[in-house]
Amino acid sequence: MDVTLDTMFRGRLVVRQEKGGYRFSVDAVLLAGLAGVQSEDRVVDLGTGCGIIPLILAYRKKGRSIVGLEIQSDLAELAEWNVSTNRFSDRIELRNLDFRKVS
């Protein structure tokens, strides 16, 4: 898989994502910024992709715990790398599964 290494917030957030195919855009950044998430909320991100929304929420100290669900294993691997590299493993949990099977 060909990937790029991008940064946000003046280099304080590092994000690895596919060079082609699914890449996050300004929509995900706006959604994370406009979400009415408080510091003690629990959050689930369905179809988390590379984990950009949980990463932004954790960076902005929103959400006590965040779970990202991703069905595509290659994207789930990128999300795991991003969470670990940015040291948010204590607040973000990622699962490689089909959210339709969550009960």
Question: Where in this protein do the model-derived segments appear?
Answer:
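Class I SAM-dependent transferase core
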Residues: 1-38
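Conserved SAM/SAH cofactor-binding pocket of Class I
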Residues: 33-103
